[in-house]
């Protein structure tokens, strides 16, 4: 037993030693593996597999070398100097474009074009230059026949007017057309350095098995014999590869997305699989994809900007606008015909209150699939709009440009009036004749139309339920929009021509008022668009159209020339078109029919042109500028356009009672107009011969007085002068019975409180001036010293009896205070003389019996003559005052 146990212990000890030695030898082998070179893999493969056939080993070695030559090498040794690859690719591409532009400028015609464009380039802002660089890159990257159209550019940039898209688009097309034919990558040093190695690799031939394997894996355009390719094709291929590899580096990151979507990166990486490809082959260039990154949409407000929407980006893909390159793509584009304006609708409704739109491509696809499931029936394609040509699809020729253009665009000419529209899935313009039935209310608005795209509009509304609910919420939140319209409401027109109050005579212009929901209208920009009026989403307008737009107005005097004119207002309405989908636009809506009076502003200037002065008894300007011929500014009166008989009373106000003047002082709208007598005064207002000295020197600077007296012929009273003398002239006994007022300085104050019994005295001073000298004769007898001074100043050459001056200077106390004023005040304003000569200020004088030189019943013949100048009157008044003071 003991021997067996000893043998067992020895066995386990030996086993432990063997295991220990094995472990030690294993660690040394691991240390040797740290220095193993995997590059020398041929010997290891031969030893492992124990290949006996040397020829098969050589073939396998050649195949592996060929496979390595066609593999993409991602291992870059940073220590190895490569001067041709140290510079950024953008610098090389910039140099290529610069060299091409320098060659293009050798042409005299192109130099002339760029000379005209250079001033515009200097004045462009930073955003406009970024847009220009983006368009230049887009047009240079695009294949022939796939260039961007102006409609696509407008949708990409949001149709912002600040970017000057038409000018920037033309400049980009000019640069593309002038430099593209001069770009030769084979001759350029930079391009040869970039493309020298890939071209040598393409010369390697593929075995049939490798080419078949590459075709099965999805490699495009495998060429087994690339040496037979012509030089022109090689040049075109290099040009396409050059612009394909330019990518987004040429485009500014502020205008174009800095990083492409993940799908594009995955597609590029899946195309080149080093473990499956036998050789790197030339692949055809992909369709041009231009994605515009807008950090903040145009419809986002400042509140939403602060709320966090500014950090989200919306990418607009314009691949749907270009012509597909295969039949499968055409089928996909035809099945998804609404993709073009649906994306534009997403941008348009991004700024509505409480609206969230999916920003990723997957979420958009899910939303479109859900909306397609809800609408089981396929939506038909909408009809084209009726409008004139507004945007030119082709490149606009610059001044001096030849008719021949390198880019030929297809145009469809039609004798009918129409505008070519760019379809969503094709670049070919389609012209539709404007022969659709339309119930027009005006030339720019249709109440009903046969081509109303009801299904398309309803589909857009269903796709944007949140946005439409936000619109309805904003509508119902307003206090005046709580009215619910029934579904059976169509539109109605009033039975009357115009809504009028009871008892009114009617409108001055006949018009038709209609409450309707129009279906199509021309926007303020000149484009015909459909107005959303479907289901619960209605937009009712009050429309009023003149029945006789150019005819004269009714209920207006025949002396006025007038005409009826249509008045328009601008309304913001939710509209729909094929390009943009649902959006808000501005429309010109007829809302009123107005009566316009011709020449009214010329004859009656507005109140702003006349300095408004309040009438008050203490106003020195009003009191000193009154004469017997003051009138009323009829444009300030509410009854200025009444009959001519009423105007007679307005021109003869009551100076004793001053009742009308009290109305003037209390009203801000009515003022007294105080013109002087001009040379065009009618004969019934002309003063007598001797009174011309008193009134002839007052020349008013107001132009409205001349306009007033120029129309005196139609406002002349119907009574004759003899009738006026008998009716308006008081008797001498009546004048004797008038008690004189106590003081002159209280004259204006007492006039406001004078009873109605003194009404005839008001007409006494507004009767024809032939009777006024009756009261002016007696002071000549009391003070005969005045006659030799004033006799030579008379204007009449041979009057029957000399006209004495007025005896205003004989009034005690208050007149002497006026006489002691300095002499320059007398010449400063002729209105002060008018205050002393005003007949209304002379009724307080005691009546005097006329002398035997002048009889009460004697009349003098009326002889109008031109008034004298104001200098003679001032001189006469000055001498009269000097003698009265003495």
From Swiss-Prot:
InterPro entries for this protein: Cystine-knot_cytokine (IPR029034), NT_N (IPR056200), Spaetzle (IPR032104), Spz/Toll_ligand-like (IPR052444)
A single GO molecular function term of this UniProt record: receptor ligand activity
This protein's record includes keyword Glycoprotein: yes
Complex formation: Homodimer; disulfide-linked.
Compositional bias (Basic residues): 815-827, 874-886
Biased composition (Pro residues): 797-807
GO cellular component: extracellular region; extracellular space
Gene3D superfamilies per record: Cystine-knot cytokines (2.10.90.10)
Originating organism: Drosophila melanogaster (Fruit fly)
Cystine connections: 509-564, 546-593, 553-595
The Spaetzle domain, residue ranges: 508-597
Segments of this protein annotated with the region Disordered: 321-340, 369-436, 675-754, 789-886
Site features described as Cleavage, chain residue numbers: 498-499
Listed name of the protein: Neurotrophin 1
Expression (tissue specificity): Detected in the fan-shaped body which is a component of the locomotion center in the central nervous system (CNS) (at protein level). Expressed in the optic lobes and brain.
Gene: NT1
Function according to Swiss-Prot or TrEMBL: Neurotrophin which may function as a ligand for the Toll-related receptors Toll-7 and Tollo. Binds to Toll-7 and probably acts as its ligand in promoting motor axon targeting and neuronal survival in the central nervous system (CNS). Involved in synaptic targeting of ISNb/d motorneurons and also some SNa motorneurons. In larvae, involved in the negative regulation of the tracheal immune response to bacterial infection perhaps by acting as a ligand for the Toll-related receptor Tollo. May be involved in the normal development of specific neurons at the neuromuscular junction.
Entry superkingdom: Eukaryota
């Amino acid at each position: 037993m003991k021997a067996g146990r000893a043998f067992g212990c020895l066995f386990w000890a030996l086993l432990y030693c063997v295991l220990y030695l094995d472990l030690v030898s294993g660690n040394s082998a691991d240390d040797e593996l740290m220095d193993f070179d995997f590059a020398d893999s041929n010997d290891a493969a031969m030893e492992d597999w124990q290949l006996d056939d040397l020829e098969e080993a050589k073939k396998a070695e050649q195949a592996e070398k060929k496979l390595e030559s066609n593999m993409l090498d991602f291992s870059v040794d940073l220590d190895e100097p490569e001067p041709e690859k140290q510079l950024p690719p953008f610098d090389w591409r910039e140099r290529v474009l610069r060299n091409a532009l320098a060659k293009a400028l050798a042409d005299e015609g192109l130099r002339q074009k760029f000379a005209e464009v250079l001033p515009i380039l200097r004045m462009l802002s930073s955003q406009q230059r970024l847009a220009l660089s983006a368009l230049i890159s887009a047009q240079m990257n695009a294949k022939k026949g796939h260039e961007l159209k102006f409609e696509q550019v407008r949708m990409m940039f949001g149709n912002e007017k600040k970017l000057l898209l038409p000018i920037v688009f033309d400049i980009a097309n000019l640069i593309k057309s002038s430099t593209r034919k001069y770009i030769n990558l084979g001759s350029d040093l930079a391009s040869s350095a970039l493309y020298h190695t890939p071209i040598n690799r393409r010369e390697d031939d593929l075995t049939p098995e490798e080419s078949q394997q590459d075709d099965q894996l999805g490699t495009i355009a495998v060429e087994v014999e690339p040496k037979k390719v012509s030089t022109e094709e090689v040049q075109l291929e290099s040009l396409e590869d050059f612009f394909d590899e330019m990518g987004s580096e040429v485009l500014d990151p502020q205008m174009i997305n800095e990083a492409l979507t993940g799908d594009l990166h995955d597609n590029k990486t899946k195309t080149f699989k080093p473990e499956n490809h036998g050789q790197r082959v030339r692949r055809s260039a992909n369709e041009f994809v231009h994605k515009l990154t807008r950090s903040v949409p145009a419809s986002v407000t400042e509140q939403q900007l602060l709320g966090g929407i500014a950090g989200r980006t919306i990418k607009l893909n314009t691949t749907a606008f270009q012509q597909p390159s295969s039949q499968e793509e055409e089928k996909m584009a035809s099945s998804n015909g609404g993709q073009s304006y649906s994306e534009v609708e997403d941008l348009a409704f991004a700024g509505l209150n409480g609206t969230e739109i999916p920003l990723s491509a997957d979420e958009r696809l899910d939303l479109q699939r859900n909306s397609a499931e809800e609408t089981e029936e396929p939506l038909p394609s909408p009809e084209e709009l009726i409008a004139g040509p507004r945007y030119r699809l082709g490149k606009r020729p610059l001044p001096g440009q030849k008719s021949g253009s390198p880019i030929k665009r297809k145009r469809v000419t039609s004798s009918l009036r129409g505008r070519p529209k760019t379809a969503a899935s094709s670049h070919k313009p389609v012209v539709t004749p404007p022969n659709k039935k339309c119930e027009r209310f005006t030339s720019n608005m249709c109440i009903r139309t046969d081509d109303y795209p009801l299904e398309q509009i309803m589909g857009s509304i269903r796709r944007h339920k949140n946005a439409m609910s936000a619109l309805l919420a904003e509508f119902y939140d307003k206090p005046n929009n709580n009215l619910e319209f029934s579904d059976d409401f169509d539109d109605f027109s009033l039975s009357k021509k115009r809504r009028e109050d009871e008892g009114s005579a009617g409108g001055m212009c006949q018009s038709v008022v209609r409450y309707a929901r129009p279906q199509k209208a021309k926007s303020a920009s000149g484009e015909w668009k459909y107005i959303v009026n479907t289901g619960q989403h209605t937009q009712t307008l009050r429309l009023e159209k003149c029945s006789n737009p150019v005819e004269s107005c009714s209920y207006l005097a025949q002396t006025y020339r007038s005409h009826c004119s249509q008045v328009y207002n601008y309304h913001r309405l939710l509209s729909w078109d094929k390009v943009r989908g649902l959006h808000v636009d501005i429309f010109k809506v007829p809302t009123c029919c107005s009566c316009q009076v011709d020449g009214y502003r010329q004859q009656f200037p507005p109140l702003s042109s006349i300095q408004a002065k309040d009438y008050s008894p203490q106003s020195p300007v009003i009191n000193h500028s009154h004469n017997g011929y003051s009138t009323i500014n009829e444009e300030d009166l509410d009854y200025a356009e009444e009959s001519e008989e009423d105007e007679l009373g307005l021109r003869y106000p009551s100076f004793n009672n001053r009742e009308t003047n009290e109305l003037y002082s209390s009203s801000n709208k009515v003022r007294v107009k105080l013109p002087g007598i001009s040379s065009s005064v009618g004969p019934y207002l002309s003063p007598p011969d001797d009174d011309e000295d008193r009134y002839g020197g007052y020349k008013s600077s107001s132009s409205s007085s001349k306009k007033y007296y120029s129309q005196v012929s139609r406002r002349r009273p119907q009574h004759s002068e003899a009738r006026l003398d008998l009716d308006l002239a008081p008797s001498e006994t009546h004048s004797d019975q008038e008690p004189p007022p106590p003081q002159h300085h209280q004259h204006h104050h007492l006039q406001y409180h004078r009873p109605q019994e003194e009404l005839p005295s008001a007409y006494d001073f507004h009767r024809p001036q032939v009777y006024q000298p009756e009261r002016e004769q007696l002071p000549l007898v009391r003070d005969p010293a005045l006659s030799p001074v004033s006799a030579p100043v008379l204007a009449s050459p041979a009057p029957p009896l000399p006209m004495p001056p007025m005896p205003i200077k004989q009034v005690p106390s208050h007149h002497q205070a006026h006489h002691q004023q300095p002499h320059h005040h007398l010449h400063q304003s002729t209105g002060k003389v008018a205050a002393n000569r005003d007949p209304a200020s002379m009724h307080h004088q005691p009546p005097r019996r006329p002398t035997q030189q002048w009889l009460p019943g004697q009349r003098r013949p009326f002889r109008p003559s031109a008034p004298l100048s104001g200098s003679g009157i001032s001189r006469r008044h000055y001498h009269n005052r000097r003698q009265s003071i003495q």
